[in-house]
Amino acid sequence: MAKSRYSRKNKGKKLQRVQENTVSTEEKSVPEVETIDFNGFQIPKVYDGKLERKPMELEIKKGFVEGMNGDAKIFCNDDLFNLLTFEMIKDISNNYPSCVRQTANAATLPGVVASLAMPDAHSGYGFSIGGVVAMRLDNSEAVICPGGVGFDINCGVRLIRTNLQREDIEQHKSRLADELFKQIPSGVGTKAQIAFSPEDFDSIMTEGLEFLVKNGYAWEEDLSHCEEHGKIANADPSLVSKSAKSRGYKQVGTLGSGNHYLEVQVVDEIMDVEAAKAMGINEVGQVCIMVHCGSRGLGHQVCQDYIDLCMKSGICNPIDKQLTGVPFNSPIGQQYYSAMNCCANFAFANRGMITYRIRQAFETVLRMKPKKMDMHLVYDVCHNIAKVEEHEVDNKKVQCIVHRKGATRAFPPQHPDISEDYKEIGQPAIIGGSMGTCSYVLVGTQEGMKKSFGSTCHGAGRKMSRVKAMDNLTSKDVINRIKEMGIELRITDPKLAAEEADEAYKDVTEVVETCQAAGISKIVLRLKPLIVIKG
């Protein structure tokens, strides 16, 4: 019997996932599992013949789990595939829901035409985080799954450019970090500096970023550089519970905690000059600001409310109860879709209000108007969302409900749903790294529309749970290392810094390069942090 091998480079090193909310992250010992050689790696013998390795892809054959409607796929290079092999061994030995199994499980859902995972994918609640699952809507059984969107509905990221150079802010870095930390509340349960009335909050859930434009908190031009123009239709606040609203209405303009962040960054390298120029980014050293956050307590409560409702309905009983959903066109399906859109609109407004505060902070410290500093929005993208989109399936254009959970929409040049400013280059996809590491801007490709339903990665992706990170790293060491890099760090709870250390994540450069090699997106530029604000 062959013994399992975790890595060509790091034999025997244990890797650990992070789970969402209710899923345990307890580290367990891995009993010996009978394995076979698979392209130079060891995988469980029970998967013999059920996987196929292709360039930058792992194909999961129909039959990997019972009831699959077709093959499933994970985009990965050899090093990223190596992380998946250990998960698969734990899956067999400890009934561990690996990313591979979760991607296969999602392929059993009614109406599914694609179950994919991006290179940054890891196990999550039901769907893997990094998953893209599409169902064709001409199938009346096609489902929508709250767990397939996740608890942080429209967690997303936006990038703001400036005409400033690094030297323009270098001497102001500490004060600018302090001002941003003061202006933008961060951490668990934080409340906004501006409290909207319940009536206004309903308007925010309906209008999204438009509400901020009407009330002077956002610029008109921000709308065209935001996915869905910052407002998703079919959003009925009456379908959002009172408890969900009570968790959200005082949180417009707050960062939250966990992996959410605000970074002042500098352009480190430009790979595609023309695409960068279309985004208003013209040279290395240019200062930008990246914001990563979502729908806060509102989204979490809406997700939980509708997971509970779906489980009680008994309409859909999948292979994994965490995948429970309902037919998209059923009453409950449409209610969840509308409530989800309310949360998405809130998240657009949340990032918009944070942008308002960022512009104020820069004006306070640098004594220049935001317009003079060219503080325009490059783009704002969703990471956790389900959307109705047109895609080609079996050589026919059909309407699909596409779940993206920890994945970024990345539509190609000339796609009708992207801004006129980006028609020639494709939709920007903003990809954040782990704390203290670089981030990237990508654009979508025509090949990506065919291979990944117009989707790409969303970040680095965890390889170590929060519990494991806290056990193996000290927050003091993590903070000191970031300071030694010349980065100004402000963090609400310093004790939790180890959870977000770069060792807990995959290499974001490897992730985006895999996406490019797979043809699903193209790298435009790289940024590195000067200031990091964390919850």
UniProtKB/Swiss-Prot annotation:
Sites where the protein binds Mn(2+) 2: 155, 292, 383
Keyword Metal-binding included in the entry's annotation: yes
PANTHER family xrefs: RNA-SPLICING LIGASE RTCB HOMOLOG (PTHR11118:SF1)
GO CC terms of this entry: nucleus; tRNA-splicing ligase complex
Pfam families (alphabetical): RtcB
Note on cofactor: Binds 2 manganese ions per subunit.
Residues that, per the record, bind GMP: 259-263, 383-384, 432-435, 439, 458-461, 534
Residues holding Mn(2+) 1: 152, 155, 260
HAMAP family assigned to the protein according to its UniProt record, in alphabetical order: RtcB_euk
Protein name according to UniProt: RNA-splicing ligase RtcB homolog 1
Keyword entries, A-Z: GTP-binding, Ligase, Manganese, Metal-binding, Nucleotide-binding, tRNA processing
Organism of this sequence: Entamoeba dispar (strain ATCC PRA-260 / SAW760)
